[in-house]
Amino acid sequence: MKPNTFGFIILLCIILLAGFGNAFAQALDISSGGAPTITGSVGGSVTGSSNVLNDLVVTINFGEVSPSNTNGIVKVVVPIAIRSNQQYKVQALVTGGSNVNAQALQRTDVGLGFNNFHAMGAKSRVCVNPHIIYAPFSNDPSGNVTINASGRATYPSTLNNAIVATTILSGPRLSNGGSSRATNDGYIFDAIFALTPQFFANGTTSATITLTISAGPTSSC
């Protein structure tokens, strides 16, 4: 049997909701948290800035995800930096990525989790109250793969868990910094994507994930 071919492309971008003008980036901010990485791919790639002062715009191409990719899983890690001078929340919204053919790759076939939340440096604000990654996203989907009764790989959380604007993270103030982005004035966390190569109906599809940071629930420092 000839293996089929299926590609999946994800665009990760941001929207900032923090006011207007220069203050817009000061109060609530998302940027690159470092260089994104991809492992286990055949013909895949991930592009994005490694500079934490640059905007977060990442394109993920999982490449070949049929059984002709003999790696156990394709994993992508995207570091994301966030800054705020107030309590905040981060929401994710996924658009696209669905197929009419149930045998084609679907949003539920792409694991999505968030973890590795840590301070950037000396100007990161340390608070008593915790920063919370919300269920079901607090996991590394590449290490939590199961095969269901139909033989399809499943994950604790997937792209399908964010097809409406969904809060993934919230907490108290993040930064002690000044009026502009710095390399040490916030926190970084990882967005982790996972896709298990298997038989899918032929084709290529794409999805876009938009991350939005805005004022969050009351969470004193």
Annotated model-derived regions:
Residues 1-10:
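Bacterial N-terminal signal peptides that target proteins for export
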